Amino acid sequence: MSISDLRQSYDDAPSFDVGDLADSPFDQFRQWFKQAVDAGIMEPNAMTLATVDGAGRPDARVVLLKDADDRGFTFYTNYGSAKARQINAHPEVTLVFYWDVLFRQVRVRGAITKVDRNEAEAYWRTRPIKSQLGAIASSQSQTLKDRQQLEDAFQAAVDKYGLEGPVPLPNDWGGYRVIPSSIEFWQGQRSRLHDRLVYARDAEGWQVKRLAP
């Protein structure tokens, strides 16, 4: 198999033009997100988070969207993690959702800020108990001697809090919200004539433009 021979024709892609867009990019995202869920895509809330560190070196990883409303796009993490340190150094990020079954991706660019403690607490209480214990056990992005060190830390958390809880929200764990300055909706099309429609925020609100593929 040659990697260069792997191609997708996008012959069955639906049409997508400015007239198809919702007035709000957040409404448009919710429409596409629901369609991704309905299409049975595994983890449609998975998104690539791209950051830049203090030396200007880019980094990226997949995280899970946990809320999307007119304020922005929210995910949760350890505030001592590499991504958190990079966000502190350069609080502008990009998110990318890719839904292959629908030939679609969404790219979100904008500033990023921490969610408040009450909001983080409310989300924390919805997490499975073992996920809470895992967050307690993991000093994210820190070097481990071996797997057993992590297993031992998890067992120590179980011994302390039990499997019924409650487990308190750690001080070094919480959420971030990406506040978009632009959101691009990409629809794959035949002959590589893909549709790229962008909402860009200015002083008057959201403006829409089409970009060449």
Residue ranges of each PLM-predicted region?
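Binding-site signature for planar aromatic cofactors or substrates
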Residues: 1-213
